[in-house]
């Protein structure tokens, strides 16, 4: 091996051994803390070091995909999730956030700028926390062995509690739990120098002279006299490089300060310093003087003429402008002491018309007033005026068909939507018997919209219009869907022509359509969509790792990251930070039992340790700037320096960074988000969630199957088939109760769809769910056709009545016979189900009839309302129902012992706006009380 390679390696080896034997530095390898005992010992060492050492070094090497981020390392209170110390990477805007608990008990956040950490390659990081035994601490951030930013004079660190077991250590807490990032190392160096910490990640910082001398002496002994000259030159070279690196570091710090100053000036604008006395904040006629004390000015004495001394006494003149009250006259000092002139503030907003421009907010202040932004429904400002926002009611004309209604988008874009029971492009609508979004007959639409084409199954919902054999008859109603001359009921490949009906294995699928023709697989699962069924595919998820070696066989994870070392990769681990090889999840909430605390203060379905807003309900967990703080409790969602609401906000593009706040048309929406508020490349008019870049369209292709009676005697599980790119679901079996639940969680939501039982046999339950948090906590809308007592009277008798029911499920027992009978029973079941509303008509569903539902849920106020249509007629309306059992959750469909059910033309849309009928209901409730 070449000498130039041997020497550096020996240097590192020697110094590493030297430091490991030294009492001045201790190193904690965070990724090797696998159990409570090891973690507690590490916390005790760290807590002691914080009282004795001057510096703490946090080192890490990791790989993070571009623009992603998450929490790299953190110390938390196990009880209330309080952050003692947290280090988060915000790759989207190149920041490292350091959050810690100050000595006064308050949280403090430091932004370290421009660390390019999310570039899809391995990075090394050192965070130096200096001055631990002083009144103020300093931070220095090194990336790839270079200083990139620092912060001085910060509030001191509170330290750690004496009970080491109460502190939780986490790494990669947020984004690393599901993304394909890789954390190679996270280590804490307690004490020592930058040079010693640098050796942990192969950064050759210049150390002290004693170390260098010891290294030289031992290296000479190893290599002999022939290399002394070369070693000497290398030492001198390293010293020169160290000096140069120190100079560059100082220059980098100075440039960082200059850069930050420039950025702040760009946000605030370049202007001359403004006088605190312009305009004069003091009373009229009173002088104003600049002052170094808060608030930056000082007012002179009040005008003498307000109190006039007379020959026989005194008189008080009229109250100052902005106040009202009587004048006062009197004689003698005692009279003046007993009688005071009282001046009361005038509410200019109430008493003076025209104080602000019409349709704007007027704010009364003591002695004056100020004008705010335009009122709701109006756009503009105090300069140009406030004008009515464009609405369907103010158009003055109707662009829509007589059987459609007008919808106004976020940016006053007008669109027309056909009414229930009608279909078309909105400008032209025709009858739609099966309510799947396609008219019975073709319509003469100018834009050639696909929804103007005639329905190829006019009486059976098929919102995808699938037609395998191209004969103009949709698969859903075609007796021979593949056109091979064999009827569907007899065809072992219903959608693939195969006249020979060859079937080499024992399942019900012919070879022509069997993705494992020689291995029985009735479910035909094909996770990676490569045409080869999972049961015979050596790489089920298609990530290039064979199943026998893949720690997540069904979820692509080429990096094979496994932080807890349990053999289950982070990408599919329900407890990625806790050793849990069994992966048990009894309540089906996607959190493994070993780390499932079921502590959820805000009731949004996310336990406090995983909730990015633990005290504010936010089931969507939206975090637009990826800073670890959910938008619902983040004062600056896009982290552009403009607060969402408070001055100098409100931010006119809350989710898109725009410190300039340019708004050319003065409509209150910034130019950068004018037509795409969340910047997800889908215009707001077409976006299912215009204020969430994570959701753009209705899609149930990825769903979780939940069995509600896993121990039932019949034990027939539902068979779910998803069509139309996730907007249609079909259930084919006469099954035990079950759910198909999408993975997208919502705060406020509008959920709609068409339900159709495509058979004349059986008479049991069909419906849908919302607010799903786990298999014991969800809302369900369920509909029985006829009255029937459940055939198993244990554990209790359950009677189902016909009609639509809205239930809140909060089960003590979870999936099993108790919950099964409670769902079947019409009414309340203590500890299991609460009946919130039942259709008083007591009418069951009809065979082969289509019904359209509209469900509105606003968990922030507990508002629920269900409307059901048969054809064009509204046949059931729950009215306003108030319940806050679940504060948001996921959506899905439900069936219980009913086969051949179609949920078609499904649609959801994020909506947190409070409906008008809730306000009316609220007023009525107040009047009653």
From Swiss-Prot:
<feature type="disulfide bond">
    <location>
        <begin position="277"/>
        <end position="288"/>
    </location>
</feature>
<comment type="subunit">
    <text>Oligomer; disulfide-linked.</text>
</comment>
<dbReference type="InterPro" id="IPR024665">
    <property type="entry name" value="TSP/COMP_coiled-coil"/>
</dbReference>
<feature type="disulfide bond">
    <location>
        <begin position="457"/>
        <end position="477"/>
    </location>
</feature>
<feature type="compositionally biased region" description="Basic and acidic residues">
    <location>
        <begin position="602"/>
        <end position="613"/>
    </location>
</feature>
<dbReference type="InterPro" id="IPR017897">
    <property type="entry name" value="Thrombospondin_3_rpt"/>
</dbReference>
<feature type="disulfide bond">
    <location>
        <begin position="445"/>
        <end position="452"/>
    </location>
</feature>
<feature type="disulfide bond">
    <location>
        <begin position="575"/>
        <end position="595"/>
    </location>
</feature>
<feature type="domain" description="TSP C-terminal">
    <location>
        <begin position="701"/>
        <end position="915"/>
    </location>
</feature>
<feature type="repeat" description="TSP type-3 7">
    <location>
        <begin position="622"/>
        <end position="661"/>
    </location>
</feature>
<feature type="repeat" description="TSP type-3 8">
    <location>
        <begin position="662"/>
        <end position="697"/>
    </location>
</feature>
<dbReference type="InterPro" id="IPR008859">
    <property type="entry name" value="Thrombospondin_C"/>
</dbReference>
<feature type="disulfide bond">
    <location>
        <begin position="374"/>
        <end position="386"/>
    </location>
</feature>
<feature type="disulfide bond">
    <location>
        <begin position="418"/>
        <end position="429"/>
    </location>
</feature>
<feature type="disulfide bond">
    <location>
        <begin position="493"/>
        <end position="513"/>
    </location>
</feature>
<feature type="disulfide bond">
    <location>
        <begin position="349"/>
        <end position="362"/>
    </location>
</feature>
<feature type="repeat" description="TSP type-3 4">
    <location>
        <begin position="525"/>
        <end position="560"/>
    </location>
</feature>
<feature type="disulfide bond">
    <location>
        <begin position="356"/>
        <end position="371"/>
    </location>
</feature>
<dbReference type="InterPro" id="IPR018097">
    <property type="entry name" value="EGF_Ca-bd_CS"/>
</dbReference>
<feature type="compositionally biased region" description="Acidic residues">
    <location>
        <begin position="624"/>
        <end position="641"/>
    </location>
</feature>
<feature type="repeat" description="TSP type-3 5">
    <location>
        <begin position="561"/>
        <end position="583"/>
    </location>
</feature>
<dbReference type="Pfam" id="PF11598">
    <property type="entry name" value="COMP"/>
</dbReference>
<feature type="glycosylation site" description="N-linked (GlcNAc...) asparagine">
    <location>
        <position position="381"/>
    </location>
</feature>
<protein>
    <recommendedName>
        <fullName>Thrombospondin-3b</fullName>
    </recommendedName>
</protein>
<keyword id="KW-0732">Signal</keyword>
<feature type="glycosylation site" description="N-linked (GlcNAc...) asparagine">
    <location>
        <position position="45"/>
    </location>
</feature>
<feature type="disulfide bond">
    <location>
        <begin position="282"/>
        <end position="299"/>
    </location>
</feature>
<dbReference type="Pfam" id="PF02412">
    <property type="entry name" value="TSP_3"/>
</dbReference>
<dbReference type="InterPro" id="IPR001881">
    <property type="entry name" value="EGF-like_Ca-bd_dom"/>
</dbReference>
<dbReference type="Pfam" id="PF07645">
    <property type="entry name" value="EGF_CA"/>
</dbReference>
<feature type="disulfide bond">
    <location>
        <begin position="516"/>
        <end position="536"/>
    </location>
</feature>
<feature type="disulfide bond">
    <location>
        <begin position="319"/>
        <end position="343"/>
    </location>
</feature>
<dbReference type="InterPro" id="IPR013320">
    <property type="entry name" value="ConA-like_dom_sf"/>
</dbReference>
<feature type="disulfide bond">
    <location>
        <begin position="689"/>
        <end position="910"/>
    </location>
</feature>
<feature type="domain" description="EGF-like 2">
    <location>
        <begin position="388"/>
        <end position="430"/>
    </location>
</feature>
<feature type="repeat" description="TSP type-3 6">
    <location>
        <begin position="584"/>
        <end position="621"/>
    </location>
</feature>
<dbReference type="GO" id="GO:0005576">
    <property type="term" value="C:extracellular region"/>
</dbReference>
<keyword id="KW-0325">Glycoprotein</keyword>
<dbReference type="GO" id="GO:0062023">
    <property type="term" value="C:collagen-containing extracellular matrix"/>
</dbReference>
<dbReference type="GO" id="GO:0007155">
    <property type="term" value="P:cell adhesion"/>
</dbReference>
<dbReference type="InterPro" id="IPR028974">
    <property type="entry name" value="TSP_type-3_rpt"/>
</dbReference>
<feature type="repeat" description="TSP type-3 1">
    <location>
        <begin position="431"/>
        <end position="465"/>
    </location>
</feature>
